[in-house]
Amino acid sequence: MTNIHTDKILILDFGAQYTQLIARRIREIGVYCEIWAWDHDPSEIAGFGAKGIILSGGPESTTLPGAPVAPQEVFDSGLPVFGICYGMQTLAAQLGGATEAADQREFGHAEVDVIAADALFAGLTDHAGAPRLNVWMSHGDHVSQVPPGFTITATTDRIPVAAMSNEDKRWYGVQFHPEVTHTLQGQTLLRRFVVDICGCQTLWTAANIIDDQIARVREQVGDDDVILGLSGGVDSSVVAALLHKAIGDKLTCVFVDTGLLRWQEGDQVMAMFAEHMGVKVIRVNAADRYFAKLEGVSDPEAKRKIIGNLFVEIFDEESNTLANAKWLAQGTIYPDVIESAGSKTGKAHVIKSHHNVGGLPQHMKLGLVEPLRELFKDEVRRLGVELGLPRTMVYRHPFPGPGLGVRILGEVKREYAELLAKADAIFIDELRKADLYDKISQAFAVFLPVKSVGVVGDARAYEWVIALRAVETIDFMTAHWAHLPYDFLGTVSNRIINELRGVSRVVYDISGKPPATIEWE
């Protein structure tokens, strides 16, 4: 079987918001890569076996004392090195060049003139055939003097060194960000570094990943049974499909129907996994327990804790009935791993980690199976399609762990959940009909616990309000509200009010993030 980890790239993270995007672009090329904090134990670099090293951007300044630096082992390794933004600046500063604060910080589109055709830039031109690239800049400092042995390969009107290289050492640097889509030929530059300069084979494909994980899972669990908390979300669904292919009936999924899921989602999950794929699924109808626990609770955090703790309690109860289960499968993905690892100094960018299954009782004593822990979300989706899951399931919008519990403002009641689930289904149905669903990042309905005066027939009505929310975003850290057509919104509003008894008004949320969050609670 092909060893898909043979050729790989190491990315040292200096805290850039785009570091994970660099890794995703490398993976899209077909090459495995890992992200390590810049202050990761340098003695492990040689043992990792990378074919090349990328130094990411970052928010620090090389002109200040104590700025993050690349370990000397990077330069002693003999490997190709590619510095991006801050990565190029520290490359210059550490190897005998100089950096300085720019008179003006540069953010956004820029034109880079290629003045020396090295292995990165040879033959690259703009649409008119000129040696010029449209790129994305995001920096305050810049390289003012290249180190000995380096050549300036690109420049702009604002900075003298937009790119540099030492071809003998195979060391390269660019001040712009090739990983973002605004840099039009950025993927070509990354491919040239990874494939042409580093010599990596493109072995990282969905089919190869599936074969690799099946072999790993079989070796890890042997003849033991595995249990999985199946939520119906993308990650757990892909884990279920992958493990079923690997170990068949040795997998048992526990699906807890909380009563807070999307419209008819419980039936859809059972139809897909139990009936169509033949996966062993235990469905626990726990709606009564959830609504009883949530009665009178309106604080969002309190609701989250109740919903999460009750899931753990129910999952524990069901696992006790499976005496042969020795392993717990989780849908942990690579960003969870990166965020949990963090940095020794705290200078690397650390985001809160989000675990698919957290706080499970210690007495369960189960080993962990995490077949997605090397994968980004987009890779998980591609695996799902390769495994035969419907595209509508694999590419659907994010849904919060507590479900409708945090889309019902205030106290959660069964009748509110049923009303909201139906309203949400109407919104999503119309988005799909209008071919808008895949053009926005997330869309959903929210139940507002306020009543509004309306007129139904000839009678006065005093009924509930439903809010619609749709956003466009790349990373969910910031988001713009989606400019949906007025006629479309009118159609959705009419359907909700006409089809759902108890709703007299529909409103559309036009708040961005920040200041608002995407979810209302």
From Swiss-Prot:
The keyword Nucleotide-binding applies. The active site is at C85 (nucleophile), H177, E179. GO terms for cellular component: cytosol. InterPro entries: Class_I_gatase-like, GATASE, GMP_synth_C, GMP_synth_GATase, GMP_synthase, GMPS_ATP_PPase_dom, NAD/GMP_synthase, Rossmann-like_a/b/a_fold. Residues 204-396 form the GMPS ATP-PPase domain. ATP binds at S231, G232, G233, V234, D235, S236, S237. SUPFAM superfamilies: Adenine nucleotide alpha hydrolases-like, Class I glutamine amidotransferase-like, GMP synthetase C-terminal dimerisation domain. Disulfide bonds: none annotated. Homodimer. This is GMP synthase [glutamine-hydrolyzing]. It comes from Xanthomonas oryzae pv. oryzae (strain PXO99A).
